[in-house]
């Protein structure tokens, strides 16, 4: 069959049709007739992705034949439009590739009794606009900031790559790229060419999934899998990788579910193939374990070979019998020297091969790293020893040989790297603990033919789909975010929110995936699964934060870029100074009595300088601390979006609090309703509730709730036929018809009821619209405001009707948190759109002197900028949509976790628990973190500043002690481990409690 050519077409596009008349004219079935026949259904469906195919149809003799072809093709699911030309023997079909394949079109025509084949070179390709994708890769072999800079530089130079961020501590890289220019395999190849290991983890594509397979052993198994997937409707593309037993599938989630794909694979293969979703976080953990195991294997191999070398050099010469054996000749060489040469060669070029490969690739790309230093030091020692051995073999004069130096350096470096891998693994414990919260399985309830749930099926929790009804047993984890549809229980949400008290759950209660059901059986309907769950978003947020770079990291990046060249230069200077001084007799020969000459004496100093220098400690100082801190913050309900936010928060001078929902509980309650006209109170409440019912503001909800209870309190919730009514149904009976509703931010709402204008809002709203407020109402309003209550004024047909008093209780911890901030040297500010009297009354209760009232949402950002003018660092704490401009404008935005998605998106911190204590925790944690980072930098710098001169022999004239190169290598290995361990001390962080918060002082 000819090669298929497809093209994407716009939803409403139609191919041109020839027209004419008479028997000679072409009989064309226009697409319009198909649209009419389908009642517009195809047109509506055409909004999705479409492709078109041109098919040659033979055997048609009349218009009845064209109708038969049209009918056969149209009957197939996924066909959008079809036009058949009798004279041209051609059919033009527009279809959804997710629901239908070209082979199905051919089959439909042939089943109708005609021959069909695809016409090549007739379809004009119209490629889709490719979106930018974000992919995550695990990158192995990075040891310092220079490695990170090297990988980032290579990635950013790739054609099609829009941006790249690489994190040393997590060994992860995130790449934003254009899939039409470059694919993930090419990105992996580029990273590997640079001397690092790379593996793809996950992509931002929502309709792509990676399945792991068991039972995929032979080519027959692969063919079976291909046949199964080809027959599935809804699959756009798949790629089977038999080597690693994985299949990557791009599918239409509206046409087919993930569970259906897995079931089809297992059923179609008669159970020979088992499919499971590859969890990228679990793969990351397994990669960590694999890296540690690989490093341990290299270390064991190196120890197995190096220990005999050490004994031959240090111990055996003192045992006469063994010494006599080692001094025996094997050709021109002593047996001991030959054994050391063989053993060390294996260590140098087999065990140490990774250093050579990494160093070569780094140099090839114009960068330098720790591997370059290790290779230089060990190679210099090895080459000298080989030359000395050969020189002694052919001249009879045997200079000292230092084979053990290169072997011991490699061994100690591997030991240090192994400890570093283990320590770095500890820094990601927070992510691992969050991943462990994800349940492995879920109990899916299945319906019978009558629609009743009669059967249970245990499935992989990753296969849960939106709308599934799941059974949650006591003591088991909630498998996905959802809503309780049956049952009551208490759920422990402390692992997500930090709240220790169990939360009661009943019908309509929201539940969070990963939380623990304590007692009672629940049936829940899943509404968010996979990457959309709260737990997945927290994991993603923490992981993103750990990948981000704090601005202070730029210092380490700069030092790393020049570190290795400087060290090599210092090593050469060290060699030349000692060698030239020895050449001219500037120091006595007794200093080099243990060596053959000043050349070897100087070379040992130079090698020690090369291998003792450690760029890794500098590179790990910031990312490991940030990684631990973000994990610790997540454990305490404080989610940090990046190292830059951590760095800014340590220097916060002002914390601005939004009033409603931040300082207050956000649970407004109507305390007073007073009418100042002849209107009945019930009618007044109905009027106000009708106007506010369309608003999402907390005060509006309080007003509607108050009116509902006023009218229905004590009345049985039943209708005339005795059936219980829902609250929504009863409320709809109460409310009046509203027209032209509009919410006025910072003022209130206005609408038309019975054709007359209704205003519900603050004093500004009614006075701006020319409504006169009587003196008695004004006095009543002032009394409300002086008692920290918000007054809501109501007018109907431009006449003042009445007002309502609303209070929003303060959070219990608000006053103590404000006092604690003052003790920390932070100035609290309250910002609100409420009137001045109410604002000042609330501020007085919590102890805030700086109040900004009657501020519109847009003006909140202006207040932030005004405080920033003198260079102050400003933090903003809020929860609503109207806070998002101020959150974005602030140096540090903190969104209350119960707030809106927009506010959370604009913030730098998310306070999951909706508790103001966490504002103090966020600032205190950032201060502790950067105190630790500064200590890490001090240690890393001090180590190199002190160690390099000592290795260069600065103390030798006074102590007569020369640092052996292998000992220098050990020092280098342990320096980076010590920095990681220093960062791990942040795991001991304990957040300030309300009982001790007042003891906090400015650091």
Swiss-Prot record:
One of its GO terms (biological process) is response to toxic substance. Keywords: Cadmium, Cell membrane, Copper, Detoxification, Ion transport, Lead, Membrane, Metal-binding, Repeat, Translocase, Transmembrane, Transmembrane helix, Transport, Zinc. The chain crosses the membrane at residues 302-322, 331-351, 372-392, 396-416, 562-582, 599-619, 938-958, 966-986. GO terms for molecular function: ATP binding; ATP hydrolysis activity; copper ion binding; P-type divalent copper transporter activity. Its EC number is 7.2.2.-. InterPro entries: ATPase_P-typ_cyto_dom_N (IPR023299), ATPase_P-typ_P_site (IPR018303), ATPase_P-typ_TM_dom_sf (IPR023298), ATPase_P-typ_transduc_dom_A_sf (IPR008250), HAD-like_sf (IPR036412), HAD_sf (IPR023214), Heavy-metal-associated_CS (IPR017969), HMA_Cu_ion-bd (IPR006122). PROSITE patterns: ATPASE_E1_E2, HMA_1, HMA_2. Residues 10-22 have a biased composition (Gly residues). GO terms for cellular component: membrane; plasma membrane. Cu cation 1 binds at residues 62, 65. Expressed in root vascular cylinder, vascular bundles and mesophyll cells of leaf blades, and anther walls and microspores of stamens. Residues 6-25 are annotated as: Disordered. Residues 51-117, 133-199, 207-273 form the HMA domain. The keyword Metal-binding applies. It is an enzyme of class 7 (translocase). It is found in: Cell membrane. Its main location: membrane. Cu cation 2 binds at residues 144, 147. Metal efflux transporter that may play a role in detoxification of heavy metals, such as zinc, copper, lead and cadmium, especially in the shoots. PANTHER family: COPPER-TRANSPORTING ATPASE RAN1, P-TYPE CATION-TRANSPORTING ATPASE. Belongs to the cation transport ATPase (P-type) (TC 3.A.3) family. Type IB subfamily. This is Cation-transporting ATPase HMA5.
């Amino acid at each position: 069959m000819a090669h298929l050519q497809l093209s994407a077409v716009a939803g409403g596009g139609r191919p041109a049709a020839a027209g004419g008349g008479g028997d000679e004219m072409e009989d064309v079935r226009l697409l319009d007739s198909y649209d009419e026949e389908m009642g517009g259904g195809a047109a509506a469906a055409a909004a999705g992705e479409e492709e078109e195919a041109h098919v040659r149809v033979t055997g048609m003799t009349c218009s009845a034949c064209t109708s038969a072809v049209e009918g056969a093709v149209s009957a197939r699911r996924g066909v959008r439009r079809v036009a058949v030309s009798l004279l041209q023997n051609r059919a033009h079909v527009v279809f959804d590739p997710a629901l239908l394949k070209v082979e199905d079109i051919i089959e439909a025509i042939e089943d109708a009794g005609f021959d069909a084949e695809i016409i090549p070179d007739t379809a004009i390709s119209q490629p889709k606009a490719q979106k930018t994708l974000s992919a995550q890769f695990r990158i192995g072999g990075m040891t310092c900031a220079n490695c990170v800079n090297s990988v980032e530089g290579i990635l950013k130079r790739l054609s099609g790559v829009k941006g790249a961020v690489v994190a040393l501590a997590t060994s992860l890289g995130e790449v934003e790229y254009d899939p039409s220019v470059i694919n993930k395999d090419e990105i992996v190849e580029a990273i590997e060419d640079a001397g690092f290991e790379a593996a793809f983890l996950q992509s931002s594509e929502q309709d792509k999934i990676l399945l792991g397979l068991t039972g995929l052993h032979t080519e027959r198994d692969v063919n079976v899998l291909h046949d199964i997937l080809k027959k599935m409707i809804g699959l756009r593309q798949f790629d089977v990788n038999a080597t690693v037993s994985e299949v990557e599938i791009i599918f239409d989630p509206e046409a087919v579910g993930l569970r259906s794909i897995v079931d089809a694979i297992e059923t179609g293969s008669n159970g020979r193939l088992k499919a499971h979703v590859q969890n990228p976080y679990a793969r990351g953990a397994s990669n960590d374990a694999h890296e540690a195991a690989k490093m341990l294997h290299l270390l064991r191999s190196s120890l197995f070979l190096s220990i005999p070398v050490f004994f031959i050099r240090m111990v055996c010469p003192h045992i006469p019998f063994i010494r006599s054996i080692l001094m025996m000749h094997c050709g021109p060489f002593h047996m001991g020297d030959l054994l050391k040469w063989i053993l060390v060669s294996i260590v140098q070029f087999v065990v140490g091969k990774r250093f050579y490969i990494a160093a070569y690739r780094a140099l090839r790309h114009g960068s330098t790293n720790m591997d370059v230093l290790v290779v230089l030091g060990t190679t210099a020692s090895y080459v000298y020893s080989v030359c000395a051995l050969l020189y002694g073999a052919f001249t009879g004069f045997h200079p000292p040989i230092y084979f053990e130096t290169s072997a011991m350096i490699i061994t100690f470096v591997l030991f240090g790297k192994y400890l570093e891998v283990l320590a770095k693994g500890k820094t990601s414990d927070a992510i691992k603990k969050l991943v462990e919260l994800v349940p492995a399985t879920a109990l899916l309830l299945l319906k019978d033919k009558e629609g009743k749930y009669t059967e249970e099926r245990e499935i992989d929790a990753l296969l849960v789909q939106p709308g599934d009804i799941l059974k949650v047993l006591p003591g088991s984890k909630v498998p996905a975010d959802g809503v309780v549809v049956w049952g009551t229980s208490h759920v422990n949400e402390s692992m997500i929110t930090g709240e220790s008290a169990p939360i009661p759950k009943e019908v309509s209660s929201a539940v969070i995936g990963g939380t623990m059901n304590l007692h009672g059986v629940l049936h829940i309907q899943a509404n968010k699964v996979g990457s959309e769950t709260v737990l997945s978003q927290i994991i993603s947020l923490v992981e993103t934060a750990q990948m981000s770079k704090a601005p202070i990291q730029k210092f380490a990046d700069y030092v790393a870029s020049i570190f290795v060249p400087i060290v090599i230069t210092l090593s050469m200077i060290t060699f030349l100074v000692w060698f030239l001084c020895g050449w001219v007799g500037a120091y006595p020969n007794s200093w080099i009595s243990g060596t053959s000459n000043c050349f070897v004496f100087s070379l040992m100093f130079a090698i020690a300088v090369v291998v003792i220098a450690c760029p890794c400690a500098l590179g790990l100082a910031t990312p490991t601390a940030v990684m631990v801190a973000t994990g610790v913050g997540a454990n305490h309900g404080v989610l940090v979006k990046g190292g830059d936010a951590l760095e800014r928060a340590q220097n916060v001078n002002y914390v601005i609090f939004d009033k409603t929902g931040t300082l207050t509980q956000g649970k407004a309650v109507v305390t007073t309703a007073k009418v100042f006209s002849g209107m009945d109170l019930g009618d007044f409440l109905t009027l106000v509730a009708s106007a506010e019912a369309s608003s999402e503001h907390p005060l509006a909800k309080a007003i509607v709730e108050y009116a509902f209870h006023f009218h229905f309190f004590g009345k049985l919730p039943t209708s005339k036929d005795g059936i219980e009514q829902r609250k929504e149904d009863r409320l709809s009976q109460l409310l009046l018809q509203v027209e032209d509703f509009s919410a006025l931010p910072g003022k209130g709402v206005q609408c038309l009821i019975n054709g007359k204008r209704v205003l519900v809002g603050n004093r500004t709203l009614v006075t701006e619209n020319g409504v006169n407020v009587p003196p008695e109402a004004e006095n009543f309003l002032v009394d409300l405001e002086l008692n920290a209550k918000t007054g809501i004024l109501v007018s109907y047909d431009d006449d003042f009707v009445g007002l309502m008093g609303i209070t929003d209780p303060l959070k219990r911890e608000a006053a103590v948190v404000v006092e604690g901030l003052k003790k920390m040297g932070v100035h609290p500010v309250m910002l609100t759109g409420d009137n001045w009297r109410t604002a000042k009354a609330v501020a007085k209760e919590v102890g805030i002197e700086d109040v900004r009232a009657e501020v519109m949402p847009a003006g909140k950002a202006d207040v932030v900028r005004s405080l920033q003018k003198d260079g102050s660092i400003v933090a903003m704490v809020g929860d609503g949509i109207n806070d998002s401009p101020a959150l974005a404008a602030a140096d540090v935005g903190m969104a209350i976790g119960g707030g809106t998605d927009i506010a959370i998106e604009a913030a730098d911190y998310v306070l999951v628990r909706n508790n103001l204590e966490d504002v103090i925790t966020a600032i205190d944690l950032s201060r502790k973190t950067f105190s630790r980072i500064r200590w890490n930098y001090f240690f890393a710098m001090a180590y190199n500043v002190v160690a390099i001169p000592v290795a260069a022999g600065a103390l030798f004239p006074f102590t007569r002690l020369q640092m052996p190169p292998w000992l220098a290598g050990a020092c280098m290995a342990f320096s980076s481990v010590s920095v990681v361990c220093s960062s791990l001390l942040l795991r001991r962080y304990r957040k300030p409690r309300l009982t001790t918060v007042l003891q906090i002082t400015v650091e």
